[in-house]
């Protein structure tokens, strides 16, 4: 009887981790631009946005992710999610990013960034994260962000005070993400972003091999427009 009880206890612990996994695992592509709530910035947030220059301040120019939301929202870039018994692994094609997120509570949160590229460079702009399940929904909490931009097109900022939650679930065959940013120093109310993704038949993401970018093409286009 003791042996049966022991086996049952072990199964409750380990099988629970397996049973909590969902259909989130797979390779996904963004479906359209998504939606966002009204952006209500504090005076500090407004100042950062006003000072932002896309052609100078976009971290993408140096192959650096501006934020987690910026990477989720990149069109035509594969994203692979792998659910393990003790962690979530997310591979983003953009910038060859690899995100390792331990499963548990905030006691498993590391001071180090959760994301690195294939060369091993860590990116604090993506924060430090841990994850847990609520039913069929995967919840990712992220803290310890370096300054960056939630929206690079408009300079919507994040800061070391930023707290982010990603709620990820599959509905009707599509992956849905509700991404909530809270930061009292930057936002009067939380900023909520929503995206959907379609599953594709692929085993992995492609290699991006980023090199430092520039906006020369954009400047040339503007110069041509000005001369017309």
Q: In which residue ranges do the predicted regions lie?
A:
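Low-complexity, intrinsically disordered segments with a bias for serine/threonine
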Residues: 12-13, 23
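Positively charged n-region of N-terminal signal peptides that target proteins for export
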Residues: 1-4
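Sec-dependent N-terminal signal peptides
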Residues: 6-10
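N-terminal signal peptide c-region/cleavage motif recognized by signal peptidases
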Residues: 15-17
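Hydrophobic small-molecule pocket/channel-lining residues, especially in calycin-type beta-barrels
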Residues: 19-228
């Amino acid at each position: 009887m003791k042996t049966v009880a022991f086996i049952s206890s072990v199964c409750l612990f380990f099988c629970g981790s397996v049973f909590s996994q969902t259909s989130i695992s797979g390779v996904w592509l963004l479906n359209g631009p998504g939606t966002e709530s009204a952006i209500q910035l504090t005076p500090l947030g407004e100042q950062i946005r006003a000072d932002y220059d896309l052609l100078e301040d976009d971290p993408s120019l140096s192959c650096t992710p501006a934020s987690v939301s910026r990477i989720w929202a990149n069109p035509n870039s594969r994203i692979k999610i792998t659910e393990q018994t003790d962690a979530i692994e997310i591979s983003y094609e953009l910038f060859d990013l690899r995100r390792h997120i331990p499963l548990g509570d905030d006691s498993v949160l590391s001071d180090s960034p959760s994301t690195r590229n294939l060369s091993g460079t860590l990116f604090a702009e993506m924060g430090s994260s841990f994850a847990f399940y609520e039913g069929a929904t995967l919840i990712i909490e992220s803290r310890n962000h370096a300054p960056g931009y939630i929206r690079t097109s408009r300079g919507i900022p994040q800061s070391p005070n930023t707290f982010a939650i990603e709620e990820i679930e599959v509905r009707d065959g599509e992956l849905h993400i509700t991404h909530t940013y809270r930061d009292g120093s930057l936002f009067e109310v939380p900023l909520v972003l929503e995206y959907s993704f379609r599953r594709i038949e692929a085993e992995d993401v492609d290699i991006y091999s980023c090199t430092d970018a520039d906006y020369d093409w954009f400047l040339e286009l503007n110069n041509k427009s000005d001369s017309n």
